[in-house]
Amino acid sequence: MSETLIKICGLTDEDGVDAAVEAGVDMIGFVFFEPSPRDLDPARAAELLDGVPHAEEGGPLRVGLFVDADDATLEAVFAGVRLDVLQFHGEESPERVEWARLEYGLPVIKALPIASAADLERAALYAEVADYLLFDARPPAGADRPGGHAQTFDWSLLAGFSAPVPWLLAGGLTPENVAEAIKVSGATAVDVSSGVETVRGIKDPERVSAFVKAVREG
């Protein structure tokens, strides 16, 4: 089996970015969604990425996370930040995902909330228009954002699940539980945000390193 892909999402400072790059993660994610404690403006994201090797130079892929963003929001980010991958984490329709993929010429990750086996049925709607699917825990009722709540879901729902495109496991992953999550779900790619923080919205370099070690060493 190939090495598990690792994405660290919601980076907000230089120490977190440096830790992720030094640990050799495959993707680093930046959130462009105001209600999130990890929200960045494009100028700050560009600042954090200054000096980070591009993917073609051996660096990680740069992912921009959006939640039901309008065209103006997307344009503002792309005007200031060079991204490699788009991530849509809201209620974007398959048509919207396909439009963005063609408009920007970039691969797209579409996040889907999971609470039961029935939720996996939506995967088929997006598999033809997204390059990756991301399965996250369904947020609590009344939440103002779709992810980053440190909640897990029943990983066994994904055991044996076959999708036409690669998928990432997210939702409450930590250095302490990620090895078990991979074992139970069969995931070949994982995404973490709050699970490598000790202060909300700020990545802890030691936990980033521990998470990557737990994934790589199982």
Curated annotation (Swiss-Prot):
CDD domains: PRAI. One of its GO terms (biological process) is L-tryptophan biosynthetic process. The keyword Isomerase applies. PANTHER family: N-(5'-PHOSPHORIBOSYL)ANTHRANILATE ISOMERASE (PTHR42894:SF1). GO terms for molecular function: phosphoribosylanthranilate isomerase activity. It is an enzyme of class 5 (isomerase). InterPro entries: Aldolase_TIM, PRAI_dom, RibuloseP-bd_barrel, TrpF_fam. Transmembrane segments: none annotated. Belongs to the TrpF family. The keyword Isomerase applies. Pfam families: PRAI. Its EC number is 5.3.1.24. This is N-(5'-phosphoribosyl)anthranilate isomerase. Keywords: Amino-acid biosynthesis, Aromatic amino acid biosynthesis, Isomerase, Tryptophan biosynthesis. Pathway: Amino-acid biosynthesis; L-tryptophan biosynthesis; L-tryptophan from chorismate: step 3/5. Signal peptide: none annotated. It catalyses: N-(5-phospho-beta-D-ribosyl)anthranilate = 1-(2-carboxyphenylamino)-1-deoxy-D-ribulose 5-phosphate.
